[in-house]
Amino acid sequence: MKVLAIDTSTYTLGVALLDGEQLIGEYITDLKKNHSLRAMPAIDALLKECEVQPSELDKIVVAKGPGSYTGVRIGVTIAKTLAWSLQIPLSGVSSLATVAASARYFPAYISPIFDARRGRVYTGLYRFENGELITVKEDQNLLLEDWCKELKELDHSVLFTGKDVLLHKETIIEVLGEKAIIGEASVHSPRPSDLGRLGLTAPAEDLHSFVPNYIRLAEAEAKWIEAQQGVEGRHG
């Protein structure tokens, strides 16, 4: 089964082509540039380099969020368009799970972190069991301090991954102490090949109803934060 994996949910642009579990080719850049101008050319270049025609693809896998609203939307739109035009299945995979997958050899919990501003993060909790990535706590948007207090109750150490971890390292260590392990650079970037493997057995989405998973705040909470920002602005 030839799978094309697409990840534009962070400023990492990743495209991978796999034949089952076997990686054929992979394209990754960590540039803060517009994915809308670069994603399709990257896909075209990868397919040509690997001498694979679009008609030979069996499945599309896309990082469905959370992450950059614009970035996630670009990837999902491209993936839906390709899947529809080629009449092949599309599977969406958590962008956080894709980052967690890079830490497959860590024996305990994995918490990928995307910054959501004002002390908040997008995160979830994962671990590997018999080589398979398992979701322990679903992806969510919450205050990092609250998340760390929640993790403090766990019986194992937690590996924090993702490029935004360094923005929050001080809070993580302050709350969790030695239970927190800050990942090395090798586990911070999402790899589209990991995304593709995660999506191999993922269920197919309904192309008409499939939308990005932005993990928006509950309306009441969002309004409260907006009101607080207004108060800060008047007194700033």
Kindly label every feature range from the protein language model:
Residues 61-90, 95:
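DPxDG-like acidic metal-binding loop motif
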Residues 3-5, 61, 71, 110-113:
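Short glycine-aspartate micro-motif
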Residues 22, 34, 89-188, 219, ...:
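Surface "functional belts" at beta-alpha junctions
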Residues 183-236:
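Acyltransferase
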